[in-house]
Amino acid sequence: MKILLIEDNQRTQEWVTQGLSEAGYVIDAVSDGRDGLYLALKDDYALIILDIMLPGMDGWQILQTLRTAKQTPVICLTARDSVDDRVRGLDSGANDYLVKPFSFSELLARVRAQLRQHHALNSTLEISGLRMDSVSHSVSRDNISITLTRKEFQLLWLLASRAGEIIPRTVIASEIWGINFDSDTNTVDVAIRRLRAKVDDPFPEKLIATIRGMGYSFVAVKK
């Protein structure tokens, strides 16, 4: 899952990039507002983290221009903490507003909340013959209905929505169970095994791949 970070403070940019990368996200980071707007319009990002005070073009201008073309979720970062500034940010199209200084754990929680909310709006997912509906929690593959538990559904959605990415066990444990990963715990591996029994085993082409020492990945196949 790809996130765009537009932040001109080098130290903030580096530690946010490192933290989000360790959490399993792919990060593009730029420090100039014009470069940020160019990337935001050119590429399809799952989320944009946007500083307000930027060289080249400020965050307000970026938001206004972006909202004429896209509805990508945006979290604003700024040292400006007045009520008027927060209202302006939200009225300009920001989905959330985080005042500096902030803890990375809070930023990560807000990132995950925005991504969950955005996924909820996109209620269906279709890939490689797999069809999922997040409203009815129905799943089918090649028009064959599959019954999953709620956690299995969430796990499959996480993998399929990030097809082609390697998702570490730590990220899966945090996203699905809200727990810190313990190397002595096989919760994730057991859940993947049960999911494969329903989604992969009855079919000749396998969708869930193990990337040894790294995690799991959803393999898109041509239909």
Curated annotation (Swiss-Prot):
Annotated GO biological process: negative regulation of DNA-templated transcription; positive regulation of DNA-templated transcription; regulation of DNA-templated transcription
Domain of life: Bacteria
Post-translational modification comment from the UniProt entry: Phosphorylated by HprS.
Domain Response regulatory: 2-115
InterPro entries membership: CheY-like_superfamily (IPR011006), CusR-like (IPR006291), OmpR/PhoB-type_DNA-bd (IPR001867), Sig_transdc_resp-reg_C-effctor (IPR016032), Sig_transdc_resp-reg_receiver (IPR001789), WalR-like (IPR039420), WH-like_DNA-bd_sf (IPR036388)
Keywords attached to this entry: Activator, Cytoplasm, DNA-binding, Phosphoprotein, Repressor, Transcription, Transcription regulation, Two-component regulatory system
Subcellular location: Cytoplasm
Coiled coil: none
Chief location bin: cytoplasm
Entry GO terms, CC: cytosol; protein-DNA complex
Modified residues annotated as 4-aspartylphosphate in this record: 51
Portion annotated as DNA-binding: 122-220
Function: Member of a two-component regulatory system HprR/HprS involved in response to hydrogen peroxide. Regulates the expression of at least 5 operons, cyoABCDE, hprRS, hiuH, cusRS and cusCFBA. Bifunctional regulator that acts as an activator and a repressor.
Note: HprSR and CusSR form a unique regulation system, where both two-component systems recognize and regulate the same set of genes, but under different environmental conditions. HprSR plays a role in H(2)O(2) response regulation, while CusSR plays a role in Cu(2+) response regulation. Under low protein concentrations, the two regulators recognize and transcribe both hiuH and cusC promoters, albeit at different efficiency, apparently in a collaborative fashion.
Record's protein name: Transcriptional regulatory protein HprR
